[in-house]
Regions:
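Contiguous N-terminal and early-domain "leader" segments and peripheral loops that mark the onset or edge
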Residues: 3-5, 12, 97-98, 104
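N-terminal regions that are enriched for targeting/export leaders
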Residues: 2, 8-60
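Extended beta-strand/loop cores of jelly-roll/beta-sandwich
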Residues: 36-40, 47-52, 59, 69-73, ...
Length: 246
């Protein structure tokens, strides 16, 4: 997939570029500087496009099973999150890129309204992948315009933090869904074709013993982002065990 023209060009900036709804963050930390948030936004959004770079438009449109989603849908859904929850709430005079997209790209956000059925996402040959990438670049540019300010409101910072964690979830889903899709192809295509490495003896497998004991699991309620399902920080007993060296 050619993504060379999908990185948004936005004035006034110098930039280095579960389908289920993600839980809300449990706290709002002091807002980071706008430039830091903009860099984080660009890094996460660019990483999603990088995952799609080896894929053809046909790869991005196919759905291998009802429990998977097309890559094109993942690209659009992550973009829709930022348009619906960040731009619509915080951008002045915001107009939807396409009003029909609320129906196409919503997943399970009941309060937003009806949505296209998940098992039928692979039937969405229209809009095209090119149109979805245009949508993505348009929304990215508008989000970065919002961040062209010395201070980011806490509510916007919290929404963007949640949206970026949500996008990272969909990066994982893109990889797993593409793996299932390509595995179903009798031609056995590779996601990344690599030159085979020179043969070398395998390092012997050994078990590395690890002591057990009382361990801390979960997240604390402080600066770092976490989902509510990761709280509270709690203690658990871990039995002694061993891990394979490779």
């Amino acid at each position: 997939m050619d993504v060379s023209r999908t990185t948004p060009t936005v004035p006034r900036h110098s930039r280095n570029a579960l389908a289920a709804p993600a839980p809300r963050p449990t706290r709002t930390a002091e807002s980071p500087p706008a430039a830091v948030l903009a860099q984080r936004f660009l890094a996460v959004r660019s990483a999603t496009l990088a995952l799609c770079a080896p894929l053809s438009p046909e790869d991005c449109a196919a759905q291998s099973m009802p429990d998977a989603s097309p890559v094109k849908w993942h690209l659009a859904h992550g973009t829709w999150f930022f348009e619906h929850f960040a731009l619509a709430a915080h951008a002045r005079r915001h107009a939807p890129f396409d009003p029909a997209f609320d129906y196409l790209w919503n997943s399970y956000y009941e309060a937003v309204g009806p949505r296209h059925a998940r098992p039928s996402r692979g039937l969405l040959t229209r809009p095209s992948l090119a149109r979805v990438l245009e949508y993505r670049a348009h929304v990215d540019a508008q989000v970065l315009d919002l961040l062209d300010a010395p201070v980011v409101p806490d509510a916007l910072a919290a929404t963007l933090a949640l949206g970026l964690a949500h996008e990272e979830q969909h990066q994982e889903l893109i990889v797993t869904d593409v793996k299932h899709l390509l595995a179903a192809n009798p031609l056995q295509p590779a996601y990344h074709a690599r030159t085979p490495a020179a043969g070398a003896p395998a390092v012997p497998l050994r078990l590395v013993p690890r002591g057990g004991g009382l361990v801390a699991i979960g997240a604390e309620d402080h600066d770092e982002f976490c989902f509510d399902a990761e709280q509270p920080l709690h203690r658990a007993w871990l039995e002694p065990h061993a891990l394979a060296s490779r």
